[in-house]
Amino acid sequence: MAKGIKHKSTTILDRLNALWALLTISDSDFNAYMGSYDELFSASPENTKEDYENGVPLKGYSQGSSSELQELYKVMHLLCTLGSVEKMYMPPEIDSEQSVLQNQILFEQIVAKDLKLNAGEKVLELGCGCGAIAEHIASLTGAIPYGMNLDESQIEKSWKNPNLSIPNFTVGDFNKPLEFDDNFFDAIYAIQPLTYVSDHAFTFKEVFRVLKPGGMFVINDVAALDTYDSKNEHQKTLIQHTRELTVFGGFWYYKYWEDSFIEAGFTLISSKGRPAVEMIKKEVSLFDKYEALFRFLSKIHLIPKKTNALMSRMNENSQSYIQAEEEELLTLNWHCVGQKPERL
């Protein structure tokens, strides 16, 4: 893929297609989505700062390969496409005056620099969604994009993008052996999918295996911060509400992410968290309007009750997300950069 291709935002047609899919959703897909919350987000694993300091081992997310997760994302992607987060992640605040999409673009420019790619080199995105981030990273670097994602519907959407090579984007699971040769990729990255890792040591070792010596591994994901106390019921409730709104799995103190890099053999280059409060407020405001509109249209029988129920469930307790970040309990954007040593 050549450099310089203009970054594309979510189009009106994208949103109309997503809306139509939500309006015509089958009973089976509706019931699977609504039931997935109890299956996926009850008693999800946590490791806090206190756990880390007491040497408590990291506990992975056991349902990271489950059919329930696939059913959740089949619908969640459609809901997110109505807003600014078709890429399925909330960006950190790079410029609080800019839109959510513009901050995604600015953050992806940072990631592209971290990856240190040259034109023609191969880069893999774990949890690539429909390939929108991969397309942008490739346009910035001239690298050849690859992607894998658990949700087949999003991979099928990536195949319709003329800027992405169909064979390079596959249904895949980072909780299983990666189907690539040793030392295959020049760089690998993951933006907010890794809370579904079942075994950090396994997944990070697999990334290490398929990465070339000197290659960069960049992640940006959810992390518990110093302030979070799992014994504080108020804080615990805010985190649970945020988990259900943003559909993250495991919740781990940021030092566990750092150790996962080091224990797999990477040199940890940098590790930092960024807030996203202003971005969150923008998106919550938008989805509050959607929720009010859907409720009204459902009441006068212009849209199915199922469609209204989907929006209401997704947007439930959205203010808790804002509060959790303002109280510095978590960030959805803990950003680590690691490098595989040139010589092993």
Where are these regions (language model features)?
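A short acidic, Gly/Pro-enriched loop at the edge of an enzyme's catalytic core
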Residues: 175-188
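Short alpha-helix
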Residues: 249-265
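Conserved alpha-helix/loop element of class I SAM-dependent methyltransferases that forms part
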Residues: 101-119
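A short glycine-rich, Lys/Arg-flanked "PGG" loop and its adjoining helix->strand segment in the class I
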Residues: 201-216
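Class I SAM-dependent methyltransferase SAM/SAH-binding core
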Residues: 133-176
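N-terminal auxiliary segments of SAM/dcSAM-dependent transferases
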Residues: 4-82
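C-terminal helical/coil "lid" or tail adjacent to the Rossmann-like core of SAM-dependent
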Residues: 73, 275-325
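Short, glycine-/aromatic-enriched active-site segment of Class I SAM-dependent methyltransferases
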Residues: 223-249
